[in-house]
């Protein structure tokens, strides 16, 4: 295995100030030399006890996702992170990342997503840090990351042979192990523990129809795994279910404008009883009933009012 390389940079990138939703810039900006690496280095410098810890890394599948994960692996090896957990094909929704961080006792997770922003070479890219509690980094941490990014003169990286991310397995590089996992299993298992999927499936197979728009983003495989494989619903209950680097030209923002086909099916044609859509990384949704739009606050209120019906919340 090669030695750790210390790559020097001339000047900091003055626009690397993240919010709680991370750092979002154009894809082209993230592809500039050293831009991603310096920001990851700043994140690592802001994490206490990084060496020997567990880190989760994944993304929403937008353009540049795989390449970014490979660079992050090399930086993790240089920093002697103990274990890096990566989903197959690099696909991991934000809710699934949150669950995996807590389940594995990870120090945090790096999510490669610009959320509901468009993808592709002409679109946007993003990096956000979730901490050990599974939630987004607090402002105090993101401020520290920015301050660090402005003072860094170099970053560490180790050139290693990156395994194919489409194959499950465990690979060792010095003090670091790379574990490529089934990114769907843990989250679908969690859903089975929280909800009675059999009961919901029986209900949906009677006189209540469902359609879900994944907007060609990360939630498509989750929806097919849960709705089709586990609950036995028809395959076409999921539309735009294949993650694409540019989201198939769609803007993955689940609203009446960008999910207009779904809205037409529910609000105009009234072809289904229930419809929903999610954004790029799966942490934002839109819910529609037959002929009606459901405000996000109302959907949360409905769940809260009926927690006694949800096994995981009893």
Residue ranges and their predicted role:
Residues 3-48:
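N-terminal glycine-rich anion-binding loop in soluble enzyme alpha/beta folds
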Residues 4-12, 26, 34, 121-269:
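Gly/Ser/Thr-enriched, mixed-charge loops and adjacent short helices
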Residues 23-25, 30, 62, 115-117, ...:
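Short, glycine-/Ser/Thr-/acidic-enriched flexible segments
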Residues 31-44, 64, 93, 179-190, ...:
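Phosphate/oxyanion-binding active-site loops and adjacent basic polyanion-contact surfaces
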Residues 40-55, 197-206:
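Glycine-rich phosphate/diphosphate-binding loops that line cofactor/substrate pockets in enzymes
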Residues 45, 56-123, 225-287:
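N-terminal small/polar loop signature for handling phosphorylated ligands or for N-terminal nucleophile
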Residues 52-60, 209-212, 314:
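Short glycine-rich phosphate-binding loop at a beta-alpha junction
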């Amino acid at each position: 295995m090669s030695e750790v390389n210390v790559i020097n940079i001339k000047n900091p990138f003055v626009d690397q100030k993240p919010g709680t939703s991370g750092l979002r810039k154009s894809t082209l900006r993230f592809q500039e030399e050293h831009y991603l690496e310096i920001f990851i280095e700043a994140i690592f410098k802001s994490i206490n006890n990084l060496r020997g810890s567990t880190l989760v890394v994944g993304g929403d599948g937008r353009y540049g996702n795989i390449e970014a994960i490979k660079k992050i692996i090399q930086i993790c090896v240089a920093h002697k992170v103990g274990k890096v957990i990566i989903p197959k094909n690099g696909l991991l929704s934000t809710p699934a990342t949150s669950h995996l961080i807590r389940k594995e006792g990870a120090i945090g997770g790096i999510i490669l997503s610009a959320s509901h922003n468009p993808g592709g070479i002409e679109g946007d890219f993003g990096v956000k840090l979730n901490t050990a509690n599974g939630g987004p980094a607090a402002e105090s941490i993101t401020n520290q990351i920015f301050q660090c990014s402005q003072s860094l003169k170099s970053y560490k990286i180790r050139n290693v042979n990156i395994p194919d991310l489409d194959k499950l397995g465990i690979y060792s590089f010095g003090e670091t192990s790379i574990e490529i996992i089934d990114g769907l299993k843990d989250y679908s298992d969690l859903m089975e523990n929280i909800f009675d999927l059999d009961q919901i499936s029986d209900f949906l197979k009677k006189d209540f129809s469902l359609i879900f728009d994944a907007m060609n983003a990360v939630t498509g495989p989750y929806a097919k795994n849960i709705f089709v494989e586990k609950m036995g619903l028809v395959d076409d209950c999921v539309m735009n279910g294949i993650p694409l680097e540019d989201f198939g030209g769609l803007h993955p923002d689940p609203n009446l404008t960008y999910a207009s086909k779904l809205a037409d099916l529910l609000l105009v044609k009234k072809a289904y009883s229930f419809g929903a859509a999610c954004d790029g990384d799966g942490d934002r949704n839109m819910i529609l009933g037959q002929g009606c739009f459901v405000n996000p606050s109302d959907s949360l209120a409905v769940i809260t009012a009926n927690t006694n019906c949800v096994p995981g919340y009893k």
